[in-house]
């Protein structure tokens, strides 16, 4: 039915007869001539109907937007005055000689000439995907997938599938559970990742594994998260963390070079502690030059408990962010930023405008200046290297609150004030994460997952001082997004059992949930390490969008629903009975 795609035509095809298939993007009637823009997945081409054949012209006259058609025609060069430089096929047009209307279209529920709401786009996703902007994104994602497969195949990796119906294991988020009809009352879990199976493959002797695989997490959604997502999953035996990073960095660098003609350069390596200290985040956006500066030592003795309290608390932090040119911010803007950091638990935000950095305390304007001595202000200006016209923003609270609030504020102000260079790329590796972190109740949790190996520690040393353990883990960060993360895995049963005990998983629970893994670790397990990339997030960055739904053909909303199919839906009573499931409505008690 088709001899070539519309978007592939150019001047080399002049005088050739072609067969095209696609949709009518636009129609224009100019007297005796009928012009249409025909669209397929590769682009647009202009078709002209100018014929004495009454049947052809009559049929062309009925064409409307999104009619699906097949046509034949002759490629001809446009006159110089009619060349459309904004169109890749703008040097040529097709003189239509035959037309077959395959299917007509009703008036569209989407207007392709204006911005439609995301809800409407998702409800009519099959129409939304016809837009060239969307089809280009899906094609670029497909190219990224193909590139990954080629690269890993050429480097000796085997594409091996792992189960989708599996056992629930604690990996940080809630599982999606699937009831078993055969084993009534029992449930499978959809995998949050193939983590344990890929480790078992290493124990099976498949020393280089990969898989582009669907994963599932029942968690609150954001613009860059989905309940089902696609992971580029990689695992290797007999490779160090340095070697894994080197190989996967090479893959991403070559991907960007191939698909975008961008050289990312060598990725700098930053310890987790440095990332948190300077940027308040373990995924810093290095396109933004602003850094946090600690000032606890300067304010620990001031008569202002908002500063001195956290400064003298071992779990507290007092840090400042110097914003170049920020003195021009209005009081309303500062109030808005104060509300913004409140989302992250911050109770307020002090500020200091620098009118003349050479004048010390006399050159600043701040509601907290009265609590600070002239010497403290002078030292503050020197430490931050603040210049005239800058503003210094203060964060003082528990360390985690300051990091989250000031880290997020740094990102927001960087974009709002155009400090962040959005036209650049800034990759890095973040390494040396703590193995465990403590919650507000003092309970330890794994920073990554319970199968991550510590650096230079025995099992007994790990149990004796888990808070000091540094994991052999690594995250790849690009423009403030974590695009991949991995680690060296525990390959010794004693170490794995010690890690479980630290996390409060007793021996019985270890056997119930991980008995198969602990058994496998007893039979000559090789050292192994791996990494997983989020394909959706990589595609989002490649396509230059900040919404992950833009690069998924049929995504879910932030409420984890599909507006196209109305999933999830309630099953019928017979289906539930067959699974021995009853739905209990939760009673809502009103206070009287």
Swiss-Prot record:
The record's GO molecular-function terms, alphabetically, read: aspartate-tRNA ligase activity; ATP binding; nucleic acid binding
| Class of this enzyme | ligase
Report residue spans for region: Aspartate.
195-198
Q: Its Gene Ontology biological processes?
A: aspartyl-tRNA aminoacylation
Q: Which reaction does it catalyse?
A: tRNA(Asp) + L-aspartate + ATP = L-aspartyl-tRNA(Asp) + AMP + diphosphate
Q: How does it assemble?
A: Homodimer.
Q: Under what name is this protein listed?
A: Aspartate--tRNA ligase
The species is: Pseudoalteromonas translucida (strain TAC 125)
């Amino acid at each position: 039915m088709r001899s070539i795609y519309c978007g592939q035509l150019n001047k080399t095809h002049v005088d050739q007869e072609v067969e095209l298939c696609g949709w009518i993007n636009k129609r224009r009637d100019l007297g005796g001539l009928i012009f249409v823009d025909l669209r397929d997945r590769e682009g647009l081409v202009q078709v002209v109907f100018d014929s004495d054949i009454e049947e052809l012209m009559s049929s062309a006259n009925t064409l409307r937007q999104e009619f699906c058609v097949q046509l034949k025609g002759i490629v001809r060069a446009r006159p110089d005055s009619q060349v459309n430089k904004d169109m890749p096929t703008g040097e040529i047009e097709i003189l239509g000689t035959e037309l077959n209307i395959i299917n007509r279209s009703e008036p569209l529920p989407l207007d392709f000439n204006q911005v439609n709401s995301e809800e409407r786009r998702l409800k009519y996703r099959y129409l939304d995907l016809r837009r060239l902007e969307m089809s280009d994104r899906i094609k670029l994602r497909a190219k990224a997938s193909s590139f990954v497969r080629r690269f890993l195949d050429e480097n000796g990796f085997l594409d091996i599938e792992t189960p989708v119906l599996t056992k629930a294991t604690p990996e940080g988020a809630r599982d999606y559970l699937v009831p078993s009809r055969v084993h009534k009352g029992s449930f499978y879990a959809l995998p949050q990742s193939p983590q344990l199976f890929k480790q078992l493959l290493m124990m099976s002797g498949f020393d280089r594994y990969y898989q582009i695989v669907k994963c599932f997490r029942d968690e609150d959604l954001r613009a860059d998260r989905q309940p089902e997502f696609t992971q580029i999953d990689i695992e290797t035996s007999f490779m160090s963390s340095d070697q894994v990073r080197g190989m996967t960095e090479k893959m991403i660098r070559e991907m960007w070079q191939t698909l975008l003609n961008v050289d990312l350069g060598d990725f700098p390596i930053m310890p987790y502690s440095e990332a948190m200290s300077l940027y308040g985040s373990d995924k810093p956006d290095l396109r933004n030059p602003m850094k946090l500066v600690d000032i606890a030592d300067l304010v620990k003795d001031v008569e202002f408990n908002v500063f001195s309290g956290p400064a003298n608390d071992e779990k507290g932090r007092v840090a400042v962010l110097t914003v170049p040119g920020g003195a021009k911010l209005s009081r309303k803007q500062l109030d808005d930023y104060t509300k913004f950091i409140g989302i992250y638990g911050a109770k307020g935000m002090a500020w200091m405008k620098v009118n003349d950095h050479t004048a010390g305390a006399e050159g600043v304007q701040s509601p907290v200046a009265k609590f600070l001595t002239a010497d403290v202000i002078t030292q503050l200006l020197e430490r931050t290297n603040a210049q005239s016209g800058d503003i210094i923003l203060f964060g003082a609270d528990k360390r985690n609150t300051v990091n989250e609030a000031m880290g997020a504020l740094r990102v927001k102000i960087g974009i709002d004030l155009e400090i962040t260079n959005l036209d650049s790329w800034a990759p890095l590796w973040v390494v040396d994460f703590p193995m465990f972190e403590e919650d507000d109740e003092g309970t330890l949790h794994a920073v990554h997952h319970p199968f991550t190996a510590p650096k230079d520690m025995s099992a007994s040393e790990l149990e004796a001082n888990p808070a000091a353990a540094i994991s052999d883990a690594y995250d790849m960060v690009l423009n403030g997004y974590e695009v991949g993360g991995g680690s060296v895995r525990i390959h010794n049963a004693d170490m794995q059992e010690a890690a479980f005990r630290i996390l409060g998983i007793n021996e019985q629970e270890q056997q119930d949930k991980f008995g198969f893994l602990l058994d496998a670790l007893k039979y000559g397990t090789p050292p192994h390490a791996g990494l997983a990339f989020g394909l959706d997030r990589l595609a989002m960055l490649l396509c230059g969008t900040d919404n992950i739904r833009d690069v998924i053909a049929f995504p879910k909303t932030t409420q984890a629903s599909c507006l196209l199919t109305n999933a999830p839906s309630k099953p019928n009573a017979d289906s539930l009975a067959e699974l021995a499931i009853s739905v209990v409505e939760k009673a809502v008690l009103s206070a009287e």
